[in-house]
From Swiss-Prot:
Name this protein carries in UniProt: Methylthioribose kinase
Protein keywords: Amino-acid biosynthesis, ATP-binding, Kinase, Methionine biosynthesis, Nucleotide-binding, Transferase
Positions with a binding annotation for ATP: N44, K61, E115, D116, L117, D250, P251, E252
Enzymatic class: transferase
Gene coding for it: mtnK
Statement: the UniProt record of this protein carries the keyword Kinase: yes
Binding site for substrate: D233, R340
Domain of life: Bacteria
Pathway per the UniProt entry: Amino-acid biosynthesis; L-methionine biosynthesis via salvage pathway; S-methyl-5-thio-alpha-D-ribose 1-phosphate from S-methyl-5'-thioadenosine (hydrolase route): step 2/2
Biological process terms in GO annotation: L-methionine salvage from methylthioadenosine
NCBIfam families in the cross-refs: MTRK
Record function comment: Catalyzes the phosphorylation of methylthioribose into methylthioribose-1-phosphate.
Amino acid sequence: MTTVQTSVYEPLTEPKAVALAVRLGLFRDGTPLACREIGDGNLNLVFHIVDQETKQGVIIKQALPYAKVVGESWPLTLKRAVIESNALRTFASYVPQYVPKVYYSDESLAITVMEDLSRLQIARKGLIEGKTYPLLSQHIGEFVAKTAFYTSDFGMNQQEKKKLAQSFVNPELCKITEDLVFTDPFFDHETNNFEDELRPDVEALWRDDRLHLEAAKLKRKFLTEADVLLHGDLHTGSIFVSADETKVIDPEFAFYGPIGFDLGQFFANLLLNALSRSELERQPLFDHIDRTWDVFASVFSNLWRTESVETYAATPGLLEDVLRHAFIDAVGFAGCEVIRRTIGLAHVADLDGIEHKDERLVAKRHALRLGRRLIIERRVFTGTEDFRRLFAETEQ
């Protein structure tokens, strides 16, 4: 990968994106190129440039200095583009099969040029359409296990880990998560967004001191536990997938945090899809949760036993303690994400796309009950089968 620092920042347009691709030598001179801006997120411009003869393409992603969902009144650091390209490169050193190739990045322009993944589909969209993606959970379990282990104090020299962690200090993007996932939904905050019919349910959460105490504990973990290099935003909209291939994208929220956070985000987004499904249709989603954890625990444990650099690694009970805390935290983090995606800023199409309003409100009330109990009762979970139990208990 090439990283450079060139001109002063300016947002790209489609013609400028094409000119950049040609200047970088990614296409031959005179090649007929098609370009379109395909970004559907809140923070970036994304250009898809394709050779109209060979159909080969590249993606040019540029960070915006503000959140599109809010506008220029919400400024954002452009450093997140560097965080993203560095995270993709770091992840590629451990799991190259699960991330796009990075061809070029420019710090000043906040640009990353990467592999075209248009042969794949965004997992959220496919899951909403009813696709099941049999290998998705196996791949994500391995992705999280290997990136977590190899960037932890167990998998790398502790001093080298501290140096790596310094390069992923990401306060601006972490602040978004601190606010939108762990704080705002639990209080009457202007960023919250929900239907008027949900107000009694939401106000009950705002008055729930028991819930607030447990959410505060989870927020503290997010703020203070620098265990592993996290993707930081591992939802189903950050994953490209097919029947046999998985690619994790958009790690601009990457930072050193608690080992269970990425797992919790992924679990939550599977649950959000399950909330929009019939009982029979939910089963593959619960199976994905089971498989993700099983693969994560198996791969992480094998690496621990064969490659750990920690002197205490052979101490009986330590691995089990690490995995137990990771699982409990993942359950709680999942609860925060379920609530946030239901009543906070930046909803998900899994719920908002439910066509009939009455059914949508039923699903969202279910989401709030489920999220609350995931947070409060996380310590009583003994395995992923408890997701099924709690899901059924909170369905009314």
